[in-house]
Regions:
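Solvent-exposed, low-complexity, repeat-rich "mucin-like" stalks and linkers
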Residues: 40-41, 57-82
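C-terminal edge beta-strand
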Residues: 45-47, 126-137
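A short beta-strand micro-motif common to beta-rich folds, especially ectodomain repeats
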Residues: 77, 113-125
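Strand-loop-strand motifs at the edges of beta-sheets in extracellular beta-sandwich domains
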Residues: 94-111
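Aromatic-lined carbohydrate-binding/catalytic grooves of carbohydrate-active enzymes
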Residues: 152, 166, 170-310
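Glycan-recognition surfaces
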Residues: 260-266, 276-277, 311, 326-428
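Carbohydrate-binding surface patches
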Residues: 410, 416-419, 424-426, 462-501, ...
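C-terminal beta-strand-rich structural cap/linker in extracellular carbohydrate-active enzymes
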Residues: 518-544
């Protein structure tokens, strides 16, 4: 790497005047969280709709998985049911092997192509079989990523132990059995540059990054990390660019940092002095950082700044492609819509807005404004309306239970699933209550999000505060969400004609996982304030042929 290589002339000028909504809301949120008293989760058990999994096996999660030729392969067969459980996989491509006790498929595949693998899970009460399509080619993240991110609970105070406890909780709580697989470290891990690549090294809160990644991989999970092309991140740690050719930022040299190498000006105000770190630098250390992440075994990158620009997006894309492992590339934040083709071409996910908050105003304004991204949402490329704000959140260090009502939380998860949005849990998983767990472990709802077609739902009807979204699924059925954004319970309905269907159809309640009725014309239901009814419409068994547009 050449540390003296500079960015093109148009990109040199620091962006000092561009104040983002993200930064304002994030910092205000941190202050509010710091002042709030610590809370415990209330008893929300009466609102649980998701049935408990059966003792017999059910294979869950994505039905299609993409990997690039020669990249390291890690896929854990997600399955519910009592343990012990054994797994088998027929038709694995050359280079892959299965651990029958853990269900982990590992190895490397060099031959491009599509491989249909027949999976089986068996325990004492029974067995389950399902196909998995492995696509060895140029695309990864063929379904929206599902995992956890540290920001919405720990923010800049995140530690190695908190990340590790979150990974353990993902496994021990059973979330991994439903397809959740990423453990992503957000801002706050960075120390100063060093090592053989002169790359960002972890601060003292992360004493053994390589060991941490290895331990999480040994659980069958994947690991994500965070950076920025600014010289400093939103939380004022160093970024992948510098204002000096040796990579040591001027504020580091002058000692304007705390024990974790976070920017800290003596007698100064971080918010007032933010422009000293929130800007692009002339010297790129992207290549060095990417080499380090590859050696650690990183699987996911959140690259965060505003405004996004083509040069830095493509630079990181190209660097990540030099690795012998696949790294999901997620852009943040507030991606300009006019450049959507570029975000789709060079990234796997792109944040469409600033930071989400745990309020109805935030989740509804973000969630119901995603329609324009529909032409760019597809397997391998996902518009990202931000993380899930359920459970214990707070942006560090003191957490509080989400301010969303139960109905608003059902709307949150249902809408994100219909949108084919990345699903990143933002709460402290070690404190997860039963209601929050029920929201995250409903496999029939997750199936809507992880459907192999990768289609974003479209609004098929809207009147005032009521809107109906519909989404075609791979098996020929349709997922339909009836949303009431108003303050009063209302009756809502859809006709088969509205959905482009005909014939006898079975309407199934996805949250309760039970069939409601057979429908030949119209389905009607009551929808609570700020609530949703999420159903799946299947062709009936009357002998009539149901046809979709």
């Amino acid at each position: 790497m050449n540390p003296k290589s500079k960015i093109p002339e148009p990109m040199k000028k620091p962006i000092l005047l561009y104040l983002t909504t993200l930064a304002l809301t994030a910092l205000c949120g941190r202050a509010a969280a710091g002042q709030a008293a610590a809370q415990s989760a209330p008893d929300m058990s009466k609102y649980i709709l998701t049935p408990k999994p059966a003792d017999t096996p059910r294979i869950n999660g994505a039905r299609v998985f993409g990997v690039r030729p020669g990249s390291e392969f890690l896929y854990t067969i997600a399955a519910t049911g009592v343990r012990p459980m054994t797994f088998s996989a027929e038709g694995l491509p050359k280079g892959l092997k299965l651990d029958p006790e853990t269900g982990r498929i590992t190895g490397r595949v060099t031959a491009p192509g599509e491989y249909t693998v027949h999976l089986k899970a068996a325990n004492a009460p029974g067995s389950c079989e399902r196909n998995l399509k492995i696509v060895v080619g140029d695309e990864i993240a063929l379904t929206p990523p599902m995992g956890w991110n540290s920001w919405n609970c720990w923010a800049r105070d995140v530690t190695q132990e908190q990340v590790l406890s979150s990974a353990r909780a993902m496994v021990e709580s059973g979330l991994a059995d439903h397809g959740w697989s990423y453990i992503n470290i957000d801002d706050g891990w960075q120390g100063k540059r060093g090592g053989k690549h002169n790359a960002i090294q972890p601060n003292t809160k992360f004493p053994d990054m390589k060991g941490l990644v290895r331990e999480i991989h040994d659980m069958g999970l994947r690991v994500g990390i965070y950076s920025t092309p600014w010289i400093g991140t939103y939380a004022a740690h160093i970024g992948s660019y510098s204002d000096n050719p040796d990579g040591v930022n001027e504020w580091i040299k002058k000692g304007r940092h705390n024990e974790h190498y976070r920017y800290q000006k003596e007698g100064g105000n971080y918010w007032k002095d933010r422009t000293e770190v929130w800007h692009l630098g002339p010297y790129s250390f992207v290549e060095a950082d990417v080499k380090q992440w590859g050696e650690w075994g990183i699987d996911y990158l959140k690259y965060d700044w505003n405004p996004l620009d083509y040069y830095h997006v493509k630079e990181m894309h190209d660097a990540l492609r030099t690795l012998d492992r696949d790294v999901v590339y997620s852009l943040s934040n507030s991606a300009p819509y006019g450049d959507a083709p570029q975000w789709m071409r060079y990234s796997n996910c792109w944040r469409t807005t600033g930071d989400i908050r745990d309020t109805w105003e935030s989740i509804s304004s973000i969630g119901f404004s995603q329609d324009r991204w529909l032409p760019f949402n597809r397997p391998g490329h996902w518009a990202d309306p931000d993380m899930l704000v359920i459970g214990m959140v707070g942006w560090g260090p003191k957490l509080h239970y989400t301010q969303l009502t139960a109905d608003e939380q059902y709307t949150h998860i249902s809408l994100w699933s219909l949108l084919a949005a990345p699903l990143l849990i933002g709460c402290d998983m070690a404190q997860m209550d039963d209601f929050t767990r029920s929201l995250l472990t409903n496999d029939e709802v997750i199936d809507v999000n992880q459907d192999p077609l990768g289609l974003q739902a479209v609004p098929v009807w809207q009147q005032g505060d009521q809107v109906i979204y519909a989404k075609h699924l791979e098996d020929g059925s349709m997922a339909v969400g009836l949303f009431n954004r108003g303050w009063q319970t209302v009756k809502m309905n859809f006709t088969l004609r509205m959905l482009g269907l005909r014939g006898r159809q079975t309407v199934r309640d996805l949250w309760r996982q039970k069939d409601l009725t057979e429908c030949t014309d119209k389905f009607e239901t009551a929808v609570a304030p700020h609530g949703v009814v999420l159903v799946r419409v299947y062709p009936g068994n009357s002998g009539e042929q149901a046809t979709g547009k």
